[in-house]
């Protein structure tokens, strides 16, 4: 099992109670000495990531991916990727492909190395087990542990009771084994319509845990399956499939989010019945629950995310404002930054909210060490250096990365007319303003010291150009660079040489940290300024940026060449994150 990308940060991982559980199992040799069907020794730690292919993965799934693959890596085990594809109505190969791509992008592999050095893939589908699942369901029927219920879904729900009232047994609960087997086989043969019968476990209708009140194990669904086609018209439920798939794959530690805590007794019930029938042997897999990732200023409900897409409130599932992994990838987040974030938040037993600034902080910390630098003017104002020769230009240089001199320098031209940021000039500056204003001197970063000498205005009195003179002996990197002391430094690009680029300034999709809490309409919390498209002027070398190349635009933040809309020689840039958290103010 390989792990290609690892976080660059050396911060220790946050508390992870699951490591203590695994350590105890290793000390007790709980899963030692096992062999697969071929007689090969099995790892003592085998985990799995089991998504349902009914949508795009989001940042919450990244926590589970990093947890399952990370634990397997750290303990010398392996992690399986398994698609829980038991609901043909909602699933599609489009989602299968996107999930495979997302897990690979995060830096993980489900392959292991065989004894002959070959790669052994551990990519599985629950649908591959349909024949076995059906046979195991018949085993439960034969043991008197499952029965066919002919009530409607509404009747079953009503008879299940609630936390204060026990459930009521189905009138079909005492059908004979023979009748149940025949009905189940007729269900498989397609003799009944959807909803006409279900297979239920026969457990305890008075159990305090409502999950254990004769849960449904199989239902009829005449629908085309993305892998098995029309072979099946009955499909197993998640609770039946999940535990059996784990056992078939020799999973040791089955890690789920907290909403499945009440399902753990059913997980154990199914496996123990099949063990007692001789299907499985001890040690059985064990389910453990951890807190899901709840991120402020975001929603992760597939239904609500789909609503945003369907109503065109965002530009698709990979919109850089979306919390989907295809979205954050297009936004410019790196796999390493997401891993770093997951390491920092750790694994807990109780649900909590993680502030978006924690994720953005991990992104900044990762990009600070890897992103090349560049200059961009986002809100341009013309600066004319009147005493600089017309038609002439000269080279200025700056480090590609200030902390990595081995990367060398980048070179860009300075000429008579430049673009500067509009906010770097103020005709009537407030106290403490050290940038450009009439009579003041500032340094053009990597260039000369200049003095503002005047302005041009339009008919409405708006400043449309600033005039200045430069001090020829003050160029950065020359002996005279420090001969004139100034307090202000501004960035710039040559007007004649700059790359005129489309830049998309992305921000948080919601203004409210909890957009759908407490009965709110999450659409009311949409941030109208979450996307601004501007024309900016960039240093000319940025024209050669390739899709997914990341940069720090000095003084502005981190940006990425869009992986979808960039063209050769014409990259489009997305803002990944600012240089500091502006939402914490």
From Swiss-Prot:
<dbReference type="GO" id="GO:0005829">
    <property type="term" value="C:cytosol"/>
</dbReference>
<feature type="binding site">
    <location>
        <begin position="292"/>
        <end position="293"/>
    </location>
    <ligand>
        <name>ATP</name>
    </ligand>
</feature>
<dbReference type="Pfam" id="PF03950">
    <property type="entry name" value="tRNA-synt_1c_C"/>
</dbReference>
<dbReference type="GO" id="GO:0004819">
    <property type="term" value="F:glutamine-tRNA ligase activity"/>
</dbReference>
<keyword id="KW-0648">Protein biosynthesis</keyword>
<feature type="short sequence motif" description="'KMSKS' region">
    <location>
        <begin position="299"/>
        <end position="303"/>
    </location>
</feature>
<dbReference type="GO" id="GO:0006425">
    <property type="term" value="P:glutaminyl-tRNA aminoacylation"/>
</dbReference>
<dbReference type="InterPro" id="IPR020058">
    <property type="entry name" value="Glu/Gln-tRNA-synth_Ib_cat-dom"/>
</dbReference>
<protein>
    <recommendedName>
        <fullName>Glutamine--tRNA ligase</fullName>
        <ecNumber>6.1.1.18</ecNumber>
    </recommendedName>
</protein>
<keyword id="KW-0067">ATP-binding</keyword>
<dbReference type="InterPro" id="IPR001412">
    <property type="entry name" value="aa-tRNA-synth_I_CS"/>
</dbReference>
<comment type="subunit">
    <text>Monomer.</text>
</comment>
<keyword id="KW-0030">Aminoacyl-tRNA synthetase</keyword>
<feature type="binding site">
    <location>
        <position position="257"/>
    </location>
    <ligand>
        <name>ATP</name>
    </ligand>
</feature>
<comment type="similarity">
    <text>Belongs to the class-I aminoacyl-tRNA synthetase family.</text>
</comment>
<keyword id="KW-0963">Cytoplasm</keyword>
<keyword id="KW-0547">Nucleotide-binding</keyword>
<dbReference type="InterPro" id="IPR022861">
    <property type="entry name" value="Gln_tRNA_ligase_bac"/>
</dbReference>
<dbReference type="Pfam" id="PF00749">
    <property type="entry name" value="tRNA-synt_1c"/>
</dbReference>
<feature type="binding site">
    <location>
        <position position="238"/>
    </location>
    <ligand>
        <name>L-glutamine</name>
    </ligand>
</feature>
<dbReference type="InterPro" id="IPR020059">
    <property type="entry name" value="Glu/Gln-tRNA-synth_Ib_codon-bd"/>
</dbReference>
<keyword id="KW-0436">Ligase</keyword>
<feature type="short sequence motif" description="'HIGH' region">
    <location>
        <begin position="51"/>
        <end position="61"/>
    </location>
</feature>
<dbReference type="Pfam" id="PF20974">
    <property type="entry name" value="tRNA-synt_1c_C2"/>
</dbReference>
<dbReference type="InterPro" id="IPR000924">
    <property type="entry name" value="Glu/Gln-tRNA-synth"/>
</dbReference>
<dbReference type="InterPro" id="IPR011035">
    <property type="entry name" value="Ribosomal_bL25/Gln-tRNA_synth"/>
</dbReference>
<dbReference type="InterPro" id="IPR004514">
    <property type="entry name" value="Gln-tRNA-synth"/>
</dbReference>
<feature type="binding site">
    <location>
        <begin position="58"/>
        <end position="64"/>
    </location>
    <ligand>
        <name>ATP</name>
    </ligand>
</feature>
<dbReference type="InterPro" id="IPR050132">
    <property type="entry name" value="Gln/Glu-tRNA_Ligase"/>
</dbReference>
<dbReference type="InterPro" id="IPR020056">
    <property type="entry name" value="Rbsml_bL25/Gln-tRNA_synth_N"/>
</dbReference>
<feature type="binding site">
    <location>
        <position position="84"/>
    </location>
    <ligand>
        <name>L-glutamine</name>
    </ligand>
</feature>
<dbReference type="InterPro" id="IPR014729">
    <property type="entry name" value="Rossmann-like_a/b/a_fold"/>
</dbReference>
<dbReference type="GO" id="GO:0005524">
    <property type="term" value="F:ATP binding"/>
</dbReference>
<dbReference type="InterPro" id="IPR049437">
    <property type="entry name" value="tRNA-synt_1c_C2"/>
</dbReference>
<feature type="binding site">
    <location>
        <begin position="52"/>
        <end position="54"/>
    </location>
    <ligand>
        <name>ATP</name>
    </ligand>
</feature>
<dbReference type="GO" id="GO:0006424">
    <property type="term" value="P:glutamyl-tRNA aminoacylation"/>
</dbReference>
